[in-house]
Amino acid sequence: MRQITTDVATLSYTNGNQHSRSNTFRSQASGSSGNSRQSGKQSKSGGSGTPTSSRSKFTEQLDQGYVPSPVPAIAPAAAVDLHRRPTYQSTGSSSTLVGSALERKINDQDPYQKHDTTERLNALRELMKKDDLDYYVVPSEDAHGSEYVAVSDKRREWISGFTGSAGVAIISKTTAYLVTDSRYWLQARTQLDNNWNLVEGGSVGGPTDWIDFLVARAKDSRIGIDARMLAHEKAVLLNSQLQAKGSKLFYPPQNLIDLIWKDKPPRSKEPVYVQPLKYTGMEANKKLAKLKDWIKAQPPTVPSYSKTPPTANQMQVGTLISNLACIAWVLNLRGDDIPFNPVFHAYLFVSAEQAILFIDPAKITEGVDEYLKSINVQRREYNDVWSFMRRKEWGDGRIIITPQTSYAISLMLTSYRYTVLPSIIEEWKAVKNPIELEGLKSAYIRDGVAFVRWLAWLEYKMSQGYVITEYEAGWRLTEFRRMGKNYRGLAYENISATGANAALPHYVPHKKDEILIERDTPYLNDSGGQYLDGTCDTTRTIIFDRPTPEMIEAYTRVLQGHIAIDSAVFPEGTTGKQLDVLARKALWKDGLNYMHGTGHGFGSFLNVHEGPHGFSSDVPLVPGHVITNEPGFYKAGHWGMRIESALYVKRVTTKHEFNGNIWLGFERLTCVPIQTKMVNPDVLSKEEKQWIKDHNRRCLEVLEPYLREDKRALSYLKKEASRDIGISKPLVKDFAIDWN
């Protein structure tokens, strides 16, 4: 029995937010009797091989690119037993959180354990019986229609045990259903207990969504739902379809889940703060003035046959904003109420005469209070919005709401006092101004620096034969991000996945799972930082050993789709949906596909998912839009791959301008090399090969000035910029030497 322990000196550093920390790393190489780590359900124990030489103490300088002399001997790859590798552990990260909600190590918690929901369902059915309900519906969203919600708003997760961000629970008198889309089918099968039936929304021959499923089952039924959690447009659709089946919706005065959720956590009291003009590019009072002018310009709601002048009650006089990101954008405020999303719970009413922010007063500091006064925004209690609506305190006229506004609000207003229009703020927010765009460029450079330093570190550690788990790899990348200027936390939970886990598009590792990164299957990392000047979202897929022909075929097709989107030139008025096929065309040639969207908009230090545009949207792309480009392929139960870069839309010059059209294209924001080991150069066009070389060389050109002090990262970057496309030819069967 033999055990080697290497202690690494403590590293202290300070990031852009002045949060300093100390971290200690420990590596262990064990003999045949040492402790083993787990990969999935299978133990990684077995074999007796170890690196041929033990290593004496070395400092964290090694992790910064400095290699002490003499360099320890490294065993040839063939001599390293991958089932018994020295371990790498990143400890103490929880002591360095930046922001109370933007970077919460939710996956530090114990892995999700399937629990018995019988008691909770029985309690819910008792309340349903009192209200004579045949069904009760529990959506994922909160009262603001948020995609990602605070812990206190995770009602569907609490009742069902399913932790995915999308899905609707439908509970009948005897049965419980969970309806979710293809991204979460495998996860739901794992997490739901025997009380639940998974309904695969969008599957072949199955229901399109939860509304389709419910309408098909409900006949002469009374269906309960919290109207606050139901969007206006969905409520109108659902009501019309249910009426045809003799069924109707019922809105209990209190949320039934809240009545039985005894240990429901309280809402955040974290203070909101002002986002400076140097990042927003436009003062809040100018945004409010623009919004007021837009309200005044909206035509009155009058019948088409009317020949009389509009009355006061037919005029559009104000708007109620419930979308949290829209409120944050208009007021140039940010908050910490929802993990990874810098927003805060509030409503905002704006008319030509006034602006009122409905918010918990505990969240308003003296400085923010003075700021609100300076932009002429009144402040009232968060829940006062309901009495304000009920009493029609603004006076005569109609209020503009969006299709996504809570149905409870439109019920309170009645149809004579509201007008439904697409969100003008979503439209404005999506088009980044020059300051926001420059901020995003800077943020993506800093995020790229962190990503490259991490890739170099990970490749080095794996080449040394270290054991690294999915969790440890993901949080090591977070540690590199923390060093960046303006860092405010993660934009979403780290997706760090190996093997079969990479086939789950929204998989998140947990600390205690201890799932090892496999060398012979693709490893996928989808992550991004929140910076004061931008929100980042990047995915790269890499492999450490020789890929199989099947992996090469799929990865090459994914990359071809990625290049096709990136290189697209299109006339003004083209929608994202019209371009979506470009990302899938190469995959379709081989009968392959992916079930998620090709890309989405994202914010300027706001939410990582932002509309209204996207590659699934009918909204035309315009200069200033930013959008992700993320085709992928997933072999369920085996491996998955995705390549994601961020783009912005700009005007381009073409050889001809047919019919006087304006032509548009994309420019890449992401500056992270793309590994070419899984690429088959024989199926690439000349232009595609050149694109890959140009991209990796551009990464070197842009990032080199920031990496001169990190020799290992710079060496990695230069290697990727000069590497030939494809893998080296095997010298012997199933074995190759990569001299790089």
Residue ranges and their predicted role:
Residues 2-740:
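Active-site neighborhoods and metal-handling regions in enzymes and metal-associated proteins
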